Amino acid sequence: MARKPIRSDLAWSTVDRIVVRGKDLPGELIGNVNLGDMAFLEITGRLPDEKESRLFNAMAVTLVEHGLTPSAIAARMTFLGAPEAMQAAVAAGLSGLGSVFVGSTEGVAKMLSETTDVEKLLENKRIPGLGHPLHKPVDPRTRRLFEVARETGHYGKYCKAMEELSSRKKLTLNATGAIGALACELGLDWRAVRGIGVMARAVGLVGHLLEEARQPIALEIWERVEEEASAHLKPKK
């Protein structure tokens, strides 16, 4: 039985050429497109128009930074043990982007790609993209993202469904819920949506690691957690 040919449609290169998604990298892309637009090209196979670019970049910017989150702490702790391997520390932080943090964008996009019937969606015990421990009753990131969506003509049925779910459940529509809906408005494959968060948060983690190198806090976190967590086990003085 003949083997299936190995095939990739993303890019090719020769001695003097590099072509990405049909675009000449040095001649058409370098110096002409921003990182968000390049990501859009990689994901969809085409460059975004001006309005798509504005919205997609807004989505990515939203997920770059959110303080000392579990992903940032994981990256810093890994960097403490292996300061020579920034890539390992970034990878450690990215590994925590799942169904609870950042990666919930994927759950929202998958859910909405299957149906926008709010009554049907309400049958789910848990709806991704709703609720936030800090930002309530309104997530300011969601408000701004939907403003950009309206300004670019991308506020549609997916956004409306999430806002209605938020209202009916009386839970904050968080930024990942908004981004999952907006990814659907842009026609993105739901399987790529978590990747937008991974791409964005990688940038933020590099910032955390540079700060850790200049202004370390990981050792202090470790020592204080160790002291508090085991305090009840130690003999009283």
What is each stretch, according to the model?
Residues 1-237:
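Non-transmembrane, aqueous-exposed alpha-helical and coiled segments at domain scale
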